[in-house]
């Protein structure tokens, strides 16, 4: 994979997710809690959906590991040479407190190392 050839598409996906996150940020959103007591909002799930759909359209054969996705056992993941690592809203606690300190993160991991990040 030539990363420079997909980077503009990944940036577009991140921008689309970011727009949705900011729209929700400006609304009266609700906060729920996951089993580990970490917060989750509609922004997390909406960004996850946008990002996973976008990344699959870019590279259907590359697995996606997202904080808001299904749990994928290590026994399966340990064989992945390359995968997308996604945190749809990194800083959800700050998001819920409206500090402005949050981001959308998308990274390509190859052989255990980050090779591209948006």
Question: Each PLM stretch: what is its role?
Answer:
Residues 77-118:
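DPxDG-like acidic metal-binding loop motif
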Residues 1-89:
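N-terminal subdomain of lithium-sensitive/metallo-dependent phosphomonoesterases centered on the IMPase/IPPase/PAP
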């Amino acid at each position: 994979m030539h990363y420079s050839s997909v980077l503009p598409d990944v940036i577009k996906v991140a921008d689309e997710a970011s727009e949705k996150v900011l729209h929700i940020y400006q609304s009266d959103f609700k906060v729920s809690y996951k089993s580990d007591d970490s917060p989750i909002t509609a922004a997390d799930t909406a960004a996850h959906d946008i990002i996973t759909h976008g990344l699959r359209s870019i590279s259907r054969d590359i697995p996606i590991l997202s904080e808001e996705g299904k749990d994928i056992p290590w026994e399966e993941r340990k064989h992945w040479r390359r995968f997308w690592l996604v945190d749809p809203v990194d800083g959800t606690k700050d998001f819920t407190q409206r500090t402005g300190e949050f981001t959308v993160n998308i990274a390509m991991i190859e052989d255990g190392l980050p090779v591209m990040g948006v």
